[in-house]
Amino acid sequence: MLNLLVLALPLLVSLVHTAPAPGQALERAGIVGGKEAPGHKWPWQVSLRCLDQYWKHFCGGSLIHPQWVLTAAHCFGPEKADPLYIRVQLGEQHLYYQDRLLLVSRIIVHPNYYDEVNGADIALLELEDPVNLSSHVQPVTLPPASETFPKGTRCWVTGWGDVHSGWPLPPPYPLKQVRVPIVENSECDMQYHLGLSTGDNIPIVRDDMLCAGSEGHDSCQGDSGGPLVCRVNGTWLQAGVVSWGEGCALPNRPGIYTRVTHYLDWIHQCIPRES
C-alpha cells in the first residue's frame, strides 16, 4: 500500500484479512453460500476503489441519490480520509473489466463512529458530479422510519468479497448475491453471547444494528459497506449496510449490519434537499 494511503485510510488493513481468529469481530461482506448475481439485477451496487498499483476494490456501497453513496464508516476509519485517493465504480457486473471510475468530492463518516462493534458504522460519499441514471445505474430506496424488517424477512446481500473465510473471490470477479433471513436483535444478541465471557446484561447487538444470515449463508470479509436489501410491497428497500460479524456463515453467528432506519435523520441532514 502506498504511504499516502496508510495515512489517508488507516483501516484498509481489512483488505488483507485472512481467516479470523476465534471470537474476533471483523469487517464483513463477501458472499458465502450464494451465487453469481444476474446482470444488472442490483443497479445501485457500488465498488469503492483505492490506489494500490491499480484502483483496487476495497469496499462495497450503494447509490442512494444520483450524487451520493452509502457505505460503512469502518471502510475509512474515524480519521478523515482524503477523497483524492478514492474512486467509485457503478453499473459493473465483473470487477476491473469495464472500469469507468468516478471522482469523490467528500467523505462524511458518522461523528459517533469509533469502531464497528460500537455502532454508528455508516458513512456517505459525495460524488464530484451526479451520475446519469439508466437501467444499469439506479439508486436504491431508503426505508421509511417505521419499517422494522421483522424476523424471518427474506432479504438479499451482494458483494465482491471472500467466498469463504480467507478465500478471495476468484476471477472474473463476478458480483455475488445470497438470500438471508432477518434475525431478531434479541435472538442475535443471545447467540453472540454464547461461548463468550461478556455478561448477558452487556449488549453486543445494539439498537442501531440489524442481523441477518444463517449457517452457510452470510456475508464475509473483504467487501464491507455493501447493501442488505429487502423487497417490501414490491419495492426494494435498503435495510442495512454490511458491518461486522464473527467468522463467515458460522452457526449462531449471523452477519451484523448497520440499521439504515436508525440513521435516516443523519442521512437527510447530510444530503441537501436541493442536491
Swiss-Prot record:
The active site is at H74, D121, S224. Its main location: secreted. One of its GO terms (biological process) is proteolysis. SUPFAM superfamilies: Trypsin-like serine proteases. One of its GO terms (cellular component) is extracellular region. Glycans are attached at N132, N233. GO terms for molecular function: serine-type endopeptidase activity. It catalyses: Preferential cleavage: Arg-|-Xaa, Lys-|-Xaa, but with more restricted specificity than trypsin. Residues 31-272 form the Peptidase S1 domain. The keyword Transmembrane helix does not apply. It is an enzyme of class 3 (hydrolase). Keywords: Disulfide bond, Glycoprotein, Hydrolase, Protease, Secreted, Serine protease, Signal, Zymogen. Residues 21-30 form a propeptide. Disulfide bonds join C59-C75, C155-C230, C188-C211, C220-C248. It is found in: Secreted. InterPro entries: Peptidase_S1_PA, Peptidase_S1_PA_chymotrypsin, Peptidase_S1A, Trypsin_dom, TRYPSIN_HIS, TRYPSIN_SER. It comes from the Eukaryota. Tryptase is the major neutral protease present in mast cells and is secreted upon the coupled activation-degranulation response of this cell type. Belongs to the peptidase S1 family. Tryptase subfamily. Homotetramer. This is Tryptase. The gene is MCT7.
